[in-house]
Swiss-Prot record:
GO biological process per UniProt: small molecule biosynthetic process
InterPro entries linked: DIOX_N (IPR026992), IPNS-like_FE2OG_OXY (IPR044861), IPNS-like_sf (IPR027443), Iron_ascorbate_oxido_reductase (IPR050231), Oxoglu/Fe-dep_dioxygenase_dom (IPR005123)
Name of the protein in its database record: 2-oxoglutarate-dependent dioxygenase tropC
Coiled coil: none
Keywords per UniProt: Dioxygenase, Iron, Metal-binding, Oxidoreductase
Enzyme Commission code: 1.14.-.-
Cited PROSITE patterns: FE2OG_OXY
Gene Ontology terms, MF aspect: dioxygenase activity; metal ion binding
Amino acid sequence: MSIGDEVIPTVDISAWLSSTASPESKNKVVEEVRSACNKYGFFNLVGHGIPAEAREKIFGCTKKFFDLPLEEKMKISVDKSLGKSFRGYEPSLIQTHQDGLLPDTKECFITGAEIPADHPDAGKFSTGPNLWPEGLSDKEFRQPVMEYRALMLDLVSTIVRILGQGIHKAFGHPSDVLNDILINPSIPMRLLHYAPQENPDPRQFGVGDHTDFGCVSILLQQKGTKGLEVWYPPKETWIPVPVIEDAFVINMGDTMHRWTGGYYRSARHRVYITGERRYSVAFFLNGNLNLKIKPLDGSGGEASVGEHINSRLAHTLGDNAKYLR
């Protein structure tokens, strides 16, 4: 499905992961990823090697969590997380991604890298222990969630290395120029639920028009659902991103956009409300929060990764930004 001739491309990275693939095959992967991120800021990724069982398990966990009674979910709401770590349950109507509209209808469960409460950095922004629901055992929920997170960290590390090769081709920088974002990174993950509405208010979305804050996002969409759209400026239109079998949706965030001088584009996107229930899982590589980046094309000054992401998140939370103070 596309608007006109525009469709978000699909890239098969199996050759990049293969020890026997030719250099030409690997270079083809780099070129396809580079082109997609430069033109659209989005692409569908297949040939990733993530088992179907792991994807099915994480959707099972997502459904189990959101089936819990609201009072159970509220026991681990984000206001109960340590300091500014922002972990746990985020109820519906907490965030407003698009100014001037009603709050987003999505609800989510947020985890990050597991940082013990006695760690010196625990309680700092996006850093601390995770919160877990009492009504779900470790075996049926915590364990598969953390296993999936580990798979996503491996996958996003692969994507960053492919992106680095693309930067090398474009600007001549070393191919490992982006690797610093993988050192002790902030890697929040959100299990997401969008409740169905037959007649939604036109001023409200599941998630309003926005760009992601960090470097690279990995989205797993549920089969048979719709709602995600990407803005394509050359044609001033929204391009739907339908669910593709075995695919992850990859997109660039604002930190990557700034770092590459806009070469890898952070694209606006949104999720509109439908009459069908929708689940998805979003993994975000924000990067090392202490890292200061300068545009690789020399176009601007230095910026702090952590300060940028904290500021953007606080803006979407509005009065609820008290959870970050």
